[in-house]
């Protein structure tokens, strides 16, 4: 009895050493389907299949047979070769996610491109408007310059005419002044001779 008990304990220890327990997430490989068995080895009977890329829960592994006990989404427990499991999702299951990511990125790039084109068009329109305003200001400035030149010519012509009129008026005043002065001198010379002669005539008549 003690020997049998010792042998039993030894077998339990060996089995505990050979099988490791750990509940982790694993993914079935990309093969069309994978057979699962009722125990950790090829000699155990087949109990069904799991789909490629299916997510399963790793319950334990057997290092001697390289089998793993898994539980699928329906709660079924079976054994599957370790090489048929992966820590990463299968390519088949990741394709839709990758396609969605590509679509999302494509939409973002399209939006960025549309926004950039819109902003570029707005900037070009603003530049065109600015050029139009600048050209208008240049034309207005040139127009004002031309008007200033014309006004300056008119001022110069008016100044010349004013100078001529002033000279004419001055000459006329000189002429009038000279005439009055000459007449005064003439009267000053003639009147003294005329007045005494009248006095003498008056005396003779008396």
From Swiss-Prot:
It holds the Pfam family SH3_3. It is a single-pass membrane protein. It is found in: Membrane. Residues 1-22 form the signal peptide. Its main location: membrane. GO terms for cellular component: cytosol; plasma membrane. Residues 23-89 form the SH3b domain. Keywords: Membrane, Signal, Transmembrane, Transmembrane helix. The keyword Cell inner membrane does not apply. The chain crosses the membrane at residues 169-191. It comes from the Bacteria. To H.influenzae HI_1605. This is Uncharacterized protein YgiM. It comes from Escherichia coli (strain K12).
